[in-house]
Amino acid sequence: MNGKKLYISDVTLRDGMHAIRHQYSLAQVQQIAGALDKAGVDSIEVAHGDGLQGSSFNYGFGAHSDIAWIEAAAEAVSQAKIATLLLPGIGTLHDLKAAYQAGARVVRVATHCSEADVAAQHIAFARELGMDTVGFLMMSHMISPQALAQQALKMESYGATCIYVVDSGGAMNMNDIRDRFRALKAVLKPETATGMHAHHNLSLGVANSIAAVEEGCDRIDASLAGMGAGAGNAPLEVFIAAADKLGWQHGTDLYALMNAADDLVRPLQDRPVRVDRETLALGYAGVYSSFLRHSEAAAERYGLSAVDILVELGKRRMVGGQEDMIVDVALDLLNRNK
């Protein structure tokens, strides 16, 4: 660590959207953003769970527009930067500009780990706007560390100044994380920062984040009470407690985060964010964490087991954006069971 301060990136108000089907009220966004700001996090990501313009039949409709959520969060903070997420093909340059005007100053441009080339235009435009521009390689477990590094290089060449390893399926262990950070560090410019976005489906969210920092990672994504897709993200308050024990500088108030997690965030969960039969299946099968609620709904509709649906999705190597295939898989399983 050599005494450097970690950049703490909170994702409660973006990844956490998945946990409550994108239904945060504006008052809740203000309350949570205000608490995170006071606790000293560096950035607070705000958007529909699937990024700008994610509100749709495919992903689920949000209670409010991204812009309304971003404006609400921006009003509530005085120190932290407001971040947002953009998936090229869902969000457009127009949406990014609107988010910037609403107060977002950091953007994470997210692609499937093997499709960095679709982000060129969006990354370049974000840099033109003067945003802190991050490349976000989702489902990083699905390709080799060396292949991931080549995709990271592409994002760097388009203008991203930080590249994230994103364990969207919560499917990786500490060795997987080390291998990927070593591969990235071997090819990226020394001034290009790196980040880690973990999911807790195998209960390794915090351990994987620690392994990333040990490999030189600069930014850590985490959320209050782990609020996020699947079994959630690395729980922010737990990661900070562990970082404290390791003597790492993080600049946040642990007790303020603990209070925000239990007083503000946990009560909002209509389905507990935890490792259980279904979320463990996500991590074990390497499935996109936000498929959880969609798969549970399909299982209920067709009288199937959500685990069976998730395992089949894993076998078919489905990735984010293929939510419409969940019903297809359910119908195939129904026919198979006849």
Swiss-Prot record:
Its EC number is 4.1.3.39. It comes from the Bacteria. Residues 6-258 form the Pyruvate carboxyltransferase domain. The active site is at residue 18. The record marks 14 as: Transition state stabilizer. GO terms for molecular function: 2-isopropylmalate synthase activity; 4-hydroxy-2-oxovalerate aldolase activity; manganese ion binding. Mn(2+) binds at residues 15, 197, 199. Substrate binds at residues 14-15, 168, 197, 288. Pathway: Aromatic compound metabolism; 3-phenylpropanoate degradation. This is 4-hydroxy-2-oxovalerate aldolase. The gene is mhpE.
